[in-house]
Amino acid sequence: MMRSKEYAYFDDGYATGFRKNYTGGRYSFIALLPNEDVSLADYVKTLANTAPEKVVKMLTSPQSTSVQATMPKFGYDFELRLNDILIALGLSDAFNASKANLSKLGKCSDGSNLYISEVLHKTHIEVDERGTKAGAVTSVAVNAEASMYPEEIKEVTLDRPFVYIIFDNETSTPIFIGSVTDIQK
């Protein structure tokens, strides 16, 4: 398990969590640990059924307090074939060799038609004491704020399934959203 002191705390009534800013401050890692009486599946449903602007407001308005964060190292790969999804959205001709019109992209020397044969979406995330690797991005930082008054230190120990988010702080947009279900201590 990795330990760090953070300064942004979340408590939405169903989960507690923290935000860990990366170098430069544009991106951050957010961990949300469902309360002991809330399953990960139920918490994910709660997030999915909450208006997006309310979720963004929660993620952009943490309590400014000390958080003792403890989390496992983890890594996941994900691959999704998008052909059927794109066809369902109306892009069926682009996948049909006889109907596709991709001539503005180029021409085959033998005169055959260009078409889309496969669209894959792959993600990779790895979090350890050296930082986070998500796609081709690697960076990590700990921000510290000086406090003149003693404050209560919140504690979040990610020792059961939790939700994580790689968040773009400038655009208030989640870049990656996932869950860790196998906790390796």
Describe the residue ranges of each PLM region:
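Secretory/exported precursors with cleavable N-terminal leaders
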Residues: M1-K185
